[in-house]
């Protein structure tokens, strides 16, 4: 999907200009066209799935007509489009929609502080009148929930006969903002179009307007999964540095669950979850370490590398032949000796000045040459090399040169490949075999690379036993722990296939921790002091013994507790901050250490899939990937593939379907074959899988032959 084109999603039938301009006095129903515009570079390029735009469409369809009452004769039609974060594209769409007399335009995204957040700058010049009351209402509602709302820049106003409101990009914030403004929108549209009574619900015309509005607002906020609170825990001992638009918890969690049977965490979109994780990576103290070049394969350079000497550092022959003086031209040459690779070529200087002789040609001054091999040093006094194919031996130590030569012909001059002081490798470059050869050529033995993160791996659950346990020693109801060895080997496999992002020496296999609060707490706190990253598996669902999530709310900061994906919905991401004191200087300020905690679901497939999607980008960022390309290399590579199977879609969540892909030389494209049943407990679905199909959240099927994106998790064997 091009980032210069507008993308339309046919959620509803789009009206034509003729329909909008048609006189409808004879019709029973009046049409209100509502435009929903998502501004996002990533969505417009097809590298992210939009959650916000469809959420607005769903709210409008489910709530707006309901607020206007059953007796209302207005037919609400929604049009949904996506444009990149470009002022020109945003303004073009807004202008088009207002010209078509859309009643309401709602934008989502681009209202923050980053350089690409330009929605307010695009909308503001188009407005005839600002509606600051709507802006204030949205800000007040959000500020009552989180102080991070002050980082939002909403704009609302009127252009011609259209009400325009900018909403944040977060699904959660959209529900909050629409919850407060939606009850007033029908009346506002009526006033703009000089029909105040026809669009105002009867209940809202009374003195109970505020009360009824609040009821509608709550209805919107809780319409999906009864979203009670946000992704973040309000922990007084930890600061949440995430600038996303989120709530904090204001109620107590009892470890092990409570009587409440719904999750208190919203479903975070995958892209938003990855963004939160990468932001928290900035809090890790990532130093440079000195690495011997033969051990640096796959690492990322943490500094520019410059040559300390020219290469070559002597004049070298490019070919086998004879070194001559170009001015001597065609003729007979006396062979003075040989210059071979590794030889200094000394004592082979032609005599000066040359004197006439009678040895071969009495008419010419005698000419001299040196036989030379490829890579050998050009002796002083010579400035050209003649290929051996263009010469002839005509006597003992006599050579006939049959062609003329130019100065410098077939000679590598000093520094012609690499001049002294030249930057040969840049900070952020990945070190491969060729880079190691280049470093060795220049005599560079050590390089500085970002220090690889230290990792602790923990499996949780009373039902687990060590994977080495014998069957006859296992009690009924006990299973072997497969997650710890799987994760430990995936860490090594990822480094082998996609670049070094962790070291085997830095992996701490903690083992199995039972479902006991104190055991788990002590282990997490101990690992947080030693490791940059903690990876746990299990204990994040809704069972009364799922202790990991409520415990992390107490000892750390939970940034999100559920992700909108299949498999892996319970994935939780947290940080634990500890302090250390320098024993040599008690007056020195205490140092803070942040540890990233990835709490993966316990089902083996969910564990592996969430590892690839969320842990790997963090590992790659801490390992230096993305330094050179502003983070574009952090996710695993993605390719487009043709399906060889008919695949069932999930209408509730996007799905990551395990498959094997290979290159089809006849079709000239990648093709994918499903690994079969995709149950999250079926580890066989990962057998031979080298990719994850990115399937949309949708009813129905994707037919055989459809083109979809696939995330590579292993090498393509053909």
Curated annotation (Swiss-Prot):
Residue ranges of the region described as MPT adenylyltransferase: 260-718
Catalyzed reactions per annotation: molybdopterin + ATP + H(+) = adenylyl-molybdopterin + diphosphate; adenylyl-molybdopterin + molybdate = Mo-molybdopterin + AMP + H(+)
CDD domains noted in UniProt: MoeA, MogA_MoaB
Biased composition (Low complexity): 222-244
Pathway assigned in UniProt: Cofactor biosynthesis; molybdopterin biosynthesis
Gene Ontology terms for molecular function: ATP binding; metal ion binding; molybdopterin adenylyltransferase activity; molybdopterin molybdotransferase activity
The keyword Iron is assigned to this record: no
Any one annotated GO CC term: plasma membrane
EC number in record: 2.7.7.75, 2.10.1.1
Class of enzymatic activity (EC top level): transferase
Region (Disordered): 1-26, 222-266, 344-364
PANTHER family: GEPHYRIN, MOLYBDOPTERIN BIOSYNTHESIS PROTEIN
Subunit and partners: Homotrimer, homodimer and homooligomer.
Name recorded for this polypeptide: Gephyrin
Encoding gene (name): gphn
